[in-house]
UniProtKB/Swiss-Prot annotation:
One of its GO terms (cellular component) is cytosol. The keyword Transport does not apply. The gene is janA. Gene3D superfamilies: Janus/Ocnus. This is Sex-regulated protein janus-A.
Length: 135
């Protein structure tokens, strides 16, 4: 096997590994209850594949704190991350209710309709509302 064939084989293996890493990334990871900031993150493998995920944590003061935390996780998996926007989530598990609203001063407003669709994959029995009102 020549150098080019070895390099090509190695790149295919790396690409396959990053595809598998991307497939293993959960679509939703948010705090179990409360009102907190969230970001939408586009997670990208070594090729052209990507997926949008939602992350929101009550212990993060800023949208950038959420993104920075998750970006480190994705880097360790060989994945890249971009943040198209954020907002806030109100999560009431007793009422099976989620509200997506507001925006991020640093990243701008996420597509709340897309956020709702992604949240519904983890919370199919919840009422999920969106609003462009509020911060």
């Amino acid at each position: 096997m020549n150098r080019f064939q070895l390099l090509s084989k190695g790149l295919r293996l790396i690409h396959k590994m990053s595809e598998e890493a991307l497939a293993g990334v959960p679509l939703v990871h948010i705090s179990p209850e409360g009102i907190f900031k969230y970001v939408m993150i586009n997670v990208i493998d070594g090729g052209d594949a990507s997926k949008a995920v939602i992350r929101g944590f009550a212990d993060c003061t800023w949208h950038a704190d959420i993104f920075d935390r998750e970006e480190e996780v994705f880097k360790k998996l060989g994945l890249r991350a971009e943040c198209p926007g954020g907002g806030r989530i109100e999560h009431n598990p007793d009422k099976k209710y989620l509200k997506v609203y507001g925006y991020s001063q640093g990243f701008g407003k996420a597509d709340h309709a897309q956020t709702k669709r992604i949240l519904a994959t983890k919370y199919p029995d919840y009422t999920i509302e969106t609003s462009d009102e509020g911060y």
